[in-house]
């Protein structure tokens, strides 16, 4: 029959058309995924967009496309793809949290709170949801609510160090020094060699006027990261308050020299995109593993 079709130009059956379309889809999708893994993001997006024209229901393809868009800095398009996935999988918390992550990069804190509300309705025990919610509240300038969300997360998982670090930083910004000290102390007792923890501890001590302790702690930050510009800059202020003008000048010079050699990180959305590009491990979109 196939020979006769070739000889006499018989038309393809519906099944043959479907099989051809599936093969074309698989080929184009594969090329898109390969380009994505090679960090050829523009090319990946083109292939994956073409694949979705062949099969708009393939959610995995939308996931890969969202990653390509994030890497290209097209966050609105990435968010739209994640919305499509979420509409198809309304109980998928991992997708909602990815939406919150992209909204955070866009500095769209209202969108973050919306998706976090949806995630909490599905599972109010998920500590990551509270963490994202807190970041949104911080972005909106609602420090008390951010602290409340972080406290809820820590209450559910005591070793949620990222939540404690963020809470301690917010409390420090709000001049709630005794509360910030509790978080800094807890973190220092559990992960003493962490640069961010040491920096928080030093800043709390500095704010409390414990200049000798702060000077020592800033030194520990430098032991972990000899290129911490913030540590040198802030320790120079501590040393100046202690009357060590020479030491302060030395730290200021070091900070200035490093600042000239190492470009300061760009702020805002651009920096968040760069950070996300450095985290290009595939998201587990189809499993609620947050």
Protein language model regions, located:
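Terminal, low-structured helical/coil segments at or just beyond the last alpha-helical repeat
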Residues: 1-17, 247-290
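Alpha-helical segment of the N-proximal tetratricopeptide repeat
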Residues: 18-60, 64-74, 94, 98-107, ...
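Structural signature of tandem alpha-helical TPR/SEL1-like repeats
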Residues: 39-46, 72-84, 106-118, 139-152, ...
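Structural marker of alpha-solenoid helical repeat scaffolds
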Residues: 54, 88-89, 122, 156, ...
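TPR/TPR-like (Sel1-like) alpha-helical repeat modules
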Residues: 223-229, 233-263
């Amino acid at each position: 029959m196939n020979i006769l079709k070739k000889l006499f130009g018989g038309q393809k059956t519906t099944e043959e058309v479907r099989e051809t379309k599936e093969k074309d889809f698989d080929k184009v999708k594969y090329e898109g995924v390969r380009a994505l893994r090679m960090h050829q993001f523009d090319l990946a997006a083109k292939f994956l967009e073409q694949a979705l024209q062949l099969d708009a229901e393939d959610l995995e393809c939308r996931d890969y496309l969202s990653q390509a868009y994030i890497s290209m800095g097209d966050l609105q398009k990435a968010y739209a793809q994640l919305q499509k996935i979420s509409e198809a999988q309304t109980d998928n918390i991992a997708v909602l949290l990815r939406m919150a992550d992209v909204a955070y990069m866009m500095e769209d804190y209202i969108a973050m709170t919306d998706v976090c509300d949806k995630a909490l309705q599905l599972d109010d025990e998920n500590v990551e949801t509270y963490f994202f919610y807190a970041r949104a509240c911080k972005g909106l300038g609602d420090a008390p609510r951010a602290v409340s969300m972080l406290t809820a997360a820590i209450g559910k998982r005591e070793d949620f160090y990222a939540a404690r670090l963020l809470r301690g930083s917010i409390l420090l910004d709000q001049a709630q020094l005794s509360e910030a000290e509790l978080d800094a102390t807890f973190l220092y007792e559990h992960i003493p060699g962490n640069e961010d923890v040491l920096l928080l501890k030093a800043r709390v001590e500095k704010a409390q006027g414990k200049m000798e302790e702060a000077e020592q702690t800033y030194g520990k930050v430098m032991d972990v990261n000899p290129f911490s510009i913030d540590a040198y800059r802030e320790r120079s202020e501590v040393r100046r308050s202690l009357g060590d003008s020479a030491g302060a000048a030395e730290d200021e010079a070091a900070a200035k020299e490093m600042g000239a050699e190492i470009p300061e990180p760009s702020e805002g959305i651009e920096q968040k995109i760069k950070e996300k590009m450095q985290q290009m491990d595939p998201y587990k979109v189809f499993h609620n593993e947050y």
